[in-house]
Amino acid sequence: MTEPLILAVVGHTNTGKTSLLRTLTRDRGFGEVSHRPSTTRHVEGARLSVDGEALLELYDTPGLEDAIALLDYLDALERPGERLDGPERMARLLDSNEARGRFEQEAKVVRQLLASDAGLYVIDAREPVLAKYRDELAVLAGCGRPLLPVLNFVASPQHREEEWRAALARLGLHALVRFDSVAPPLDGERRLYESLALLLERARPQLDRLIADHETQAAA
């Protein structure tokens, strides 16, 4: 029996992280969905199984609230002459008092991403590409885990998909997936899992089984 793939669902507040999880788990009662910022205040998890075998664990995380200040704080954590890599800086953050105070919500996100195989970075594609989102990606990249951007709300006439694609490419994130959690495409789960399999080749067997199970249920 293989170990389940562990994914952290991360991103800014109100981008549709919980709605995406409701779609993937087919559980309308998962989490709390609201237009209020920071609706999710703690990490919530769900497990997807096929024939009694757990294949995927998904963790909904709080929205990142102040990545700009957090990135400045991470830079200040390095002592003179030090060259810490991303995970080392994150470990120092989690050991700090700020991780239990000012950056408590961000620390929850970092802690879960470090404990995961990869992260789904959910983006409200209607939003302009702002500096705070670039800083969020810089913080998340410091965890050293593969990130798959998920462009949400792409069915909206106000989407800025091309702007986001260009911005993500400049950050080295060329693999992404379109997945509107309000009006999910019929093949949305397949495309999401196939994109993940490109980033996590060792998890392909679990992801292929999830795809096959979803298509069997859809055809029933």
Residue ranges, per PLM feature:
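Conserved C-terminal guanine-recognition region of P-loop GTPase G domains, centered on the G4
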Residues: 79-176
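Conserved G1/Walker A P-loop phosphate-binding module
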Residues: 1-90
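Amphipathic alpha-helical transducer elements in NTP-driven molecular machines
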Residues: 40-43, 103-106, 189
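Canonical P-loop GTPase G-domain recognition
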Residues: 153-219
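Non-catalytic alpha-helical coupling and interface elements of nucleotide-dependent molecular machines
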Residues: 15, 63, 67, 142-145, ...
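Non-catalytic alpha-helical scaffolds
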Residues: 1-17, 118, 142, 198-220
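Short, conserved acidic/polar surface loops in the N-terminal third of protein domains
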Residues: 68-72, 132, 160, 188-190
